[in-house]
From Swiss-Prot:
SUPFAM superfamilies: S15/NS1 RNA-binding domain (SSF47060). It comes from Buxus microphylla (Littleleaf boxwood). It is found in: Plastid, Chloroplast. Keywords: Chloroplast, Plastid, Ribonucleoprotein, Ribosomal protein. GO terms for biological process: translation. The lineage of its organism: Eukaryota, Viridiplantae, Streptophyta, Embryophyta, Tracheophyta. This is Small ribosomal subunit protein uS15c. Part of the 30S ribosomal subunit. One of its GO terms (molecular function) is structural constituent of ribosome. GO terms for cellular component: chloroplast; ribonucleoprotein complex; ribosome.
Length: 90
């Protein structure tokens, strides 16, 4: 498995920032999601990895929800950089 292929230019910018920031955490969750997704394409019956993927997706969604409430501009910028679809309003 090639982990370095998912790291982009954003990682270079984020190394200088606070690792506890919401953007950095979402970026790390995004990389983990891509890695787990490629793993599950090969191992479809790996249910523990499926559960882990769902947990990470939930964590990322909660962080994005928090960011959209606190700072809409940073939220829009982040989802634009990572290529994440905007969440629908309920």
């Amino acid at each position: 498995m090639v982990k370095n292929s998912f790291i982009s230019v954003i990682s270079q910018e984020k190394k200088e920032e606070n690792k506890g920031s919401v953007e950095f955490q979402v970026f790390n969750f995004n990389n983990k999601i891509r890695i787990l997704t490629s793993h599950l394409e090969l191992h479809r019956k790996d249910y523990s990895s499926q559960r882990g993927l769902r947990k990470i997706l939930g964590k990322r969604q909660r962080l994005l929800s928090y960011l959209s409430k606190k700072n809409r501009v940073r939220y829009k910028e982040l989802i634009g950089q990572l290529g994440i679809l905007e969440q629908k309003a309920r």
